[in-house]
């Protein structure tokens, strides 16, 4: 049987190390896979639909792109334990006199890259639901680092956080995990910033399978993947790099806010020219 081809986007050099370890594990489990690398998520989704690969390790936005372009027929696979129930935080300075969303009317708000679900798309939809309309009620200051990587490159999010510290923006958006990390490492001082608003929970990355991929083969891939054990030192290294302790069953209910954001902004039409 030919190797199952699995796509991954190189948002960081460590990605090839991660997938080298995963491929070795699958080889040892007598279910060989071949990692195929892409420079951005659009290329990966294009590759999946063109059958260059059988499975894609997708960002939430790449999942939505795949879902829409296959009219909902793509297969949905596993997630990391850390992909579920994420939230984005709207952060302001404690001395800013900004105490409500409405206080941001006509102010400048910092966002991550144009295609970041957590630092731009879901936040814009959140503001919309709370009465602040994009392009009208506030000024967007965007930090386009790693466009095409769907916010996996944290640079834009970090630059926006630094802009808040430097009073270049009145507020900034960041993923909950990044907020916690930046408070812990001193990038942000918890005495100088506060969380003004939090989005509802959403989910992050997920495996997508080509609609015509044999379902039993896809399920076997998932079964083997779930055998990875954080207590096994040879697995732990990879799992730490990939930010998980356990592979879990995927779900798509956590992509509702991102789906709404795409509809509100007509994002794919603008971004891909479709």
Label every model-predicted segment.
Residues 176-214:
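Active-site/pore-lining binding-face segments in mid-to-C-terminal subdomains
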Residues 3-29, 38, 61, 85-160, ...:
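Bilobed "Venus flytrap"/periplasmic-binding protein-like clamshell domains
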Residues 2-5, 13-18, 202, 208-209, ...:
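An extracytoplasmic/periplasmic, membrane-proximal ligand-sensing/linker region
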Residues 2, 66-78, 134, 182-196:
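Ligand-binding "clamshell"
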Residues 57-70, 123, 128-129, 158-190:
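A ligand-binding cleft/hinge motif common to bilobed small-molecule-binding domains
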Residues 77-87, 196-203:
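Short Pro/Gly-enriched coil loops immediately N-terminal to beta-strands
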Residues 48-49, 104, 164-165:
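Hydrophobic residues within well-ordered alpha-helices
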Residues 42-66:
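N-terminal low-complexity or amphipathic/hydrophobic leaders
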């Amino acid at each position: 049987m030919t190797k199952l081809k699995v796509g991954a986007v190189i948002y960081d050099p460590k990605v090839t190390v991660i997938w080298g370890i995963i491929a070795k594990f699958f080889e040892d489990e007598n279910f060989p896979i071949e990692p195929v690398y892409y420079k951005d998520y659009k290329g990966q989704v294009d590759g999946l639909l063109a059958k260059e690969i059988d499975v894609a390790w997708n960002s939430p936005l790449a999942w939505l792109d795949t879902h829409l372009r296959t009219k909902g027929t793509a297969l949905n696979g596993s997630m990391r334990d850390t992909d579920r129930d994420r939230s984005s935080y709207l952060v302001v300075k404690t001395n800013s006199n900004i105490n409500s969303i409405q206080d941001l009317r006509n102010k400048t708000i910092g966002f991550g890259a144009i295609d970041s679900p957590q630092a731009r798309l879901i936040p814009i939809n959140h503001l919309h639901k709370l009465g602040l309309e994009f392009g009208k009620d506030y000024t967007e200051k965007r930090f386009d680092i790693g466009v095409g990587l769907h916010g996996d490159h944290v640079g834009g999010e970090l630059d926006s956080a630094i802009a808040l510290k430097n009073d270049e923006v009145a507020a900034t958006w960041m993923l909950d995990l990044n907020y916690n990390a930046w408070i812990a490492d001193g990038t942000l001082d918890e005495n100088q910033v506060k969380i003004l608003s939090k989005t509802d929970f959403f989910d992050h990355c997920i495996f997508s399978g080509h609609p015509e991929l044999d379902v039993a083969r896809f399920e076997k891939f998932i079964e083997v993947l779930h055998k990875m054990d954080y207590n096994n030192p040879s697995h732990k290294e990879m799992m730490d790099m990939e930010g998980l302790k356990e592979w879990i069953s995927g779900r798509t209910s956590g992509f509702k806010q991102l789906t709404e954001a795409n509809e509100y902004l007509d994002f794919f039409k603008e971004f891909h020219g479709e």
